[in-house]
Amino acid sequence: MAGLESQLVNRAVPLVSTRPTDAQRCRNKRRDFDTFINDKSFSNYIDDAYILLGKANFFNGNFFNAAEYFDYTIKNYKDNQSNYLTALNWKARSLMQLKRIAEANEILDTLDSILPKLKGKKLVSESFATLAQMNINLNNDTAAITLLKDAIKTSKQIQNKIRWTYILAQLYERTQNHQEAIRRYKEVQKSNAPFEMYFNAVLNRIRLIGPQNAGKNKQEQLLALLKDNKNFNYRDQVYFQIAESFAVDKEYDKAVENYNLSTTQTRDNQHQKGLSYLRLAELNFKHFRDYLTAKEYYDSTITILPKNSPEYNLILKKTLNLQYLTDRYELIALQDSLQEIARLPEELRMAKINSLINPVQIAKP
C-alpha cells in the first residue's frame, strides 16, 4: 500500500498552490484586466495584464484558460525576459494540472535550456521549482531533491523557502534518508511556517526519530501534542501516529484502540479517516485473521476514499475477494450448524430447532 500511504499519510504539498481563491474576487479581477487590455493608453503593460489574467484563471482552477493566456504571452512578448520566463513557468504548471505531461515537458525543455543565461535569482528559483514539480509528478525523487535544493538556495521569498524545505523533507523521507528528513522538518519547525505545516513537521519528525527527546518514548511525545489546545483539530493524525508506533512494537490491541480513536476524532480530514480504516482492515486480516471484521473495515475504506485515489482498485478487489470469502464462511458455518443438529437424538433435535425458531422469552419479574 505504499502508493496510498504516500498520498494519505505524507501527502506532498504542491510546489505551487492551486487552492481556489474567492471566485467572485477572481471574476472581478479578470474584468479589470480585460478593461485594462482594451485601453490602448496602457499598451506597454499589456503583457503584465496577460500574466495576471493567466494567474487569476490558474488559482480559480481554470487551467485550460490559464494555459492559453500564458501561451499568448510566450508567443507575443519574448523580448520581455521576465514575463517570458514567468509565462513558460506557469504554462508548464497549467499543463501539469491538465495532465498534459508531454506538452508540459516540451515547455520545461525550453525553460531548462535558458536557465544558464538567466541573471535574476527570483526567476531562477521559480524555474527550479517548476522543474522539481515535474520530477515529483514522475516519481523522479532524486532529481527533484537536487532541483528543490537549488530553488531554496536561489530564492529570496521566505514563505517559498519554507514550503520547499517541507517538501524537501518529504522527499528525503520517501527516499529513506531519514537523517536529512529530520533535519529539514526541524528547519520548518523553527521557521515562521503556517500552523498546519508546522504541526505536520513536528509530527513527522517525532515519527522518524523514535524514542528520543529527553528520555520520552514516542507515544509520550505524541500524547504531549494532544495536551496543546492549538492541536485540537489534528487529534486524528496524532492518534494515528500513536497507533502506528504500537503496531511497529507489535502491540496490536493498543494499535487498534488508537486507530479507532483516530477515526472518531476526524473532523474534515477524510483521507486520514480512510487510512485509519485501512490500517484496521489490514490488522484484522493479517494479524487477527478476523476476515468478517476486515471486510467491514475495507468497505468503510472504499466508501470514504475517492475513486481516483492510488490503489483504490486494488483495495476494491480485495474487498470483493473478502466478500466471496465471508459468503463461503457463513455458508460453511450454516452447514456445520445443520449437521450438528442432524446428529442430535430426535427429541433433542426438535427442541434445538424450536429454540432457534422461537427463542426463549425471559419472564418479567
Question: Which role does the model predict for each range below?
Answer:
Residues M1-P365:
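Acidic, polar-rich low-complexity tracts and alpha-helical solenoid repeat scaffolds
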